[in-house]
């Protein structure tokens, strides 16, 4: 009886959304739209399944009311909207739930698109840096390409990078679980009485009802003083910097006799005084006379600094430090014996902790092992500085870029024992994120190198990175709770640890290495990647196959460490890169989705990194001709069963750039033939100079001439698909051809022919 009453009291989500939607229509003056304009927009969406506009165009040309009007067709197509009303079951907001999906295979499917989106970047950056707001986000839903559920291809997955409050403006340095206030739409707040979190939740709900799964970028570490850390101090390692400074100062006094062997006593005392000052403030100038002594002190103390930092990181010391941290926090908040939540934390807590010399132990370099060794405070004493070492004890501080992050205290590095309470908090934290926003999956950041020599020895963790067993527990937990929940690992395939990430950690898709290896990804090498995946999957006992992303672009492409992104290839080169990933199908055992970034569709250059590092709108390139080509290639690929269900085979690839490949499916009488010049107009290649140093060289593609191909097997060419400026158009041949000749192919030119048996 009680269960029945509970069910009776559960809020009907469709009814609630209809109430909200009515207010949105009233606020946007929906009823004032002209019928002619309504019909125009709806007809486009009926034709394509989405509005085939670039984001800048929809920002500039569509009102909020027009956006809602056109979106109604997407909702109708998904069976959740009829006669002006939403109608769906409470547990079927996600398109995966509505279609009764039982595993993560939907994310792996050939032909499926994943689009990386930053909510802040969706505003009109050509006009203002003001971050995107609610209707900017909703306009993105309208223009997202659809899939083909008859072939199990879901509509484009929205992959959201972190939308939380940021430190230093960076999306990957969260300060709390709360949505950034910069995203708040004051008009929506005033008219709907929705706070910024509710605005994001509504956006995700509308996107899922329009057919788009939504996944979120999550971190296996926290921001330096993120609120989850301050509410649960035991989940991080802590250093008492004042204690470390005192210990180093004492040791400095002890090594005076050793210094007196080489230097005058008076000079040593002056240098020691300056050194102790620098431990606290980091600032100081040395004449050449004292600099030599300073460097000698640094050399002598290096091992000691490592030793005392390691000692302070051990469990017994950490328990004492956590107790001290809790006392400081309790005093700052004027609370006692209270279980804290993020809502209890304020800026005063951070001030009191740092005033007491209490800082979280940071991450480090991608190859760091052990714990970082405290060196001194920064100039003006605003934050601590550390040295980082790898598993061989080599100094890798120059590679360290994670000193602003706080790794979870998952494991005691001194003995390899796991901290189960920390693991439980971590998993519950991400479970709560999923519940709050109804995410369909996670992309888990920073999980490269977690099973190699840099992060574990004989199976025991040795670095700050999340141990693989924790990720395994997280994935199992989420998939047991939500059968269709899919996870994507940021693993770049180094050393081929496929089994470890797939079978042991339960990831569905791996990030791959397409961005750092952009210049190596010729059609033949992409096919070798497909074959690598096939070889792994055919060996599996069950049909839970692994997938690798085909990455046209991601947020790393513009970073200095990689410096590889599509616009470097020129317009034709970028389109051909997109075409390659769409038309080099891997077959049954190598289904691979394609990832791209908001802005790629219009050949936007150098803006992704800016919006990841700063909470601003993206400045977009207004190249609508490029958009038409980009969009048309995607639609064309999804229109062919041979592409989404079949397999590509390289017929020939020559060093001058000439390549031909066949795309076929055994049960079909039709196939496709692609002929291309795979050279890009411009492309960066890495090579070694005469000193053995790695350098980047820009190369220019060349035209190729007088090529021919004999149609393979019993196929004959019957038509060519030619881009007409807006779409690809089929042009039938007068006669069926068995041979094709090409007088000239310019760099990145490609031709698509239909073959029949």
Question: Which functions belong to the PLM regions below?
Answer:
Residues 2-213, 221, 227-232, 237-424, ...:
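N-terminal structural segment of carbohydrate-active enzymes
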Residues 115-117, 158-160, 214-216, 442, ...:
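Hydrophobic faces of well-ordered beta-strands that scaffold small-molecule active sites
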Residues 205, 216, 221-250, 315, ...:
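Aromatic- and carboxylate-enriched substrate-binding clefts and catalytic-loop regions
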Residues 294-296, 301-302, 310, 403-496:
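Active-site neighborhood of glycoside hydrolase catalytic domains
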Residues 319-359, 363, 482-617, 677-680, ...:
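Conserved alpha/beta catalytic core and glycan-binding cleft of carbohydrate-active enzymes
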Residues 587, 610-652:
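Aromatic- and carboxylate-lined catalytic core of secreted/periplasmic carbohydrate-active enzymes
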Residues 651-712:
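Carbohydrate-binding surface patches
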Residues 732-757:
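C-terminal beta-strand-rich structural cap/linker in extracellular carbohydrate-active enzymes
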């Amino acid at each position: 009886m009680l269960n029945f009453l509970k069910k009776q009291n559960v809020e009907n989500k469709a009814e609630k959304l209809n109430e909200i939607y009515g207010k949105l229509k009233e606020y946007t003056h929906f009823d004032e739209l002209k019928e002619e304009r309504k019909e125009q927009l709806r007809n486009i969406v009926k034709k394509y399944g989405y509005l085939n506009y670039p984001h800048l165009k929809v920002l500039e040309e569509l009102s909020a009311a027009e956006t809602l009007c056109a979106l109604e067709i997407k909702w109708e197509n998904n069976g959740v909207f009829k006669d002006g009303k939403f109608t769906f079951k409470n547990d079927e907001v996600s398109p995966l739930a509505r279609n009764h999906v039982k595993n993560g295979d939907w994310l792996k499917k050939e032909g499926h698109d994943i689009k990386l989106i930053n909510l802040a970047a969706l505003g009109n950056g050509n006009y203002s840096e003001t971050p995107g707001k609610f209707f900017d986000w909703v306009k993105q839903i309208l223009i997202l390409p659809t899939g083909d559920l008859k072939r199990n291809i879901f509509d484009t997955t929205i992959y959201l990078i972190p939308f939380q409050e940021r430190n230093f403006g960076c999306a990957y340095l969260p300060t709390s679980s709360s949505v950034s206030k910069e995203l708040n739409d004051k008009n929506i707040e005033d008219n709907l009485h929705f706070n910024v979190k509710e605005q994001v939740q509504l956006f995700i709900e509308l996107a899922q009802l329009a057919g788009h799964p939504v996944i979120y970028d999550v971190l296996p570490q926290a921001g330096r003083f993120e609120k989850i850390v301050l509410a649960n101090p035991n989940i991080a390692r802590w250093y008492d910097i004042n204690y470390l400074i005192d210990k180093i100062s004492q040791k400095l006094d002890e090594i005076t006799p050793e210094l007196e062997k080489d230097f005058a006593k008076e000079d040593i005392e002056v240098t020691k005084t300056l050194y102790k000052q620098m431990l606290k403030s980091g600032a100081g100038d040395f004449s050449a006379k004292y600099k030599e002594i300073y460097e000698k002190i640094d050399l002598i103390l290096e091992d000691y600094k490592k030793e005392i930092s390691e000692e302070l990181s051990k469990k017994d010391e950490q328990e004492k430090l956590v107790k001290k941290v809790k006392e400081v926090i309790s005093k700052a908040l004027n609370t006692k014996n209270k279980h804290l939540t993020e809502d209890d934390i304020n800026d005063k807590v951070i001030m009191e902790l740092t005033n007491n010399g209490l800082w979280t132990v940071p991450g480090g370099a991608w190859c760091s092992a052990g714990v970082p060794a405290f060196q001194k405070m920064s100039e003006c004493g605003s934050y601590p500085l550390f040295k980082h070492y790898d598993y061989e004890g080599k100094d890798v501080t120059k590679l360290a870029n994670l000193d602003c992050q706080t790794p979870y205290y998952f494991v005691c590095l001194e003995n390899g024992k796991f901290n189960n309470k920390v693991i439980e908090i971590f998993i519950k934290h991400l479970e709560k994120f999923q519940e709050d926003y109804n995410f369909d999956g996670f992309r888990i950041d920073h999980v490269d190198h977690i099973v190699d020599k840099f992060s574990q020895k004989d199976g025991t963790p040795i670095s700050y990175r999340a141990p693989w067993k924790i990720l395994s527990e997280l994935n199992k937990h989420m998939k047991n709770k939500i059968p269709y929940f899919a996870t994507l690992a940021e693993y770049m395939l180094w050393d081929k640890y496929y089994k470890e990430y797939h079978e042991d950690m339960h990831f569905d898709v791996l990030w791959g290495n397409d961005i750092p290896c952009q210049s190596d990804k010729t059609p033949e090498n992409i096919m070798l990647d497909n074959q690598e995946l096939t070889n792994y999957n055919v060996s599996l006992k069950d049909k839970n196959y692994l997938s690798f992303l085909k990455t046209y672009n991601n947020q790393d492409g513009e970073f200095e460490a990689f410096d590889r992104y599509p616009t470097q290839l020129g317009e034709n080169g970028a389109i051909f890169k997109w075409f390659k990933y769409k038309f080099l199908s891997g077959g049954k055992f190598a289904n691979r989705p394609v990832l791209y970034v908001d802005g790629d569709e219009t050949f936007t250059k150098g803006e992704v990194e800016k919006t990841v590092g700063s909470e601003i709108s993206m400045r977009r390139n207004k190249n609508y001709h490029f958009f038409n080509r980009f969009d048309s290639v995607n639609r064309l690929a999804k229109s062919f069963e041979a592409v989404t269900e079949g397999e590509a085979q390289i017929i020939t690839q020559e060093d001058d750039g000439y390549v031909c490949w066949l795309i076929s499916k055994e049960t079909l009488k039709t196939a496709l033939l692609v002929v291309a010049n795979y050279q890009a107009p411009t492309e960066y290649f890495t090579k070694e100079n005469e000193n053995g140093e790695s350098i980047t060289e820009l190369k220019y593609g060349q035209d190729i001439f007088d090529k021919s191909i004999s149609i393979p097997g019993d196929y004959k060419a019957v038509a060519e698909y030619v881009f007409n400026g807006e779409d690809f158009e089929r042009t039938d041949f007068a006669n069926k051809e068995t041979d094709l000749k090409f007088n000239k192919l310019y760099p990145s030119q490609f031709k698509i022919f239909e073959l029949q048996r």
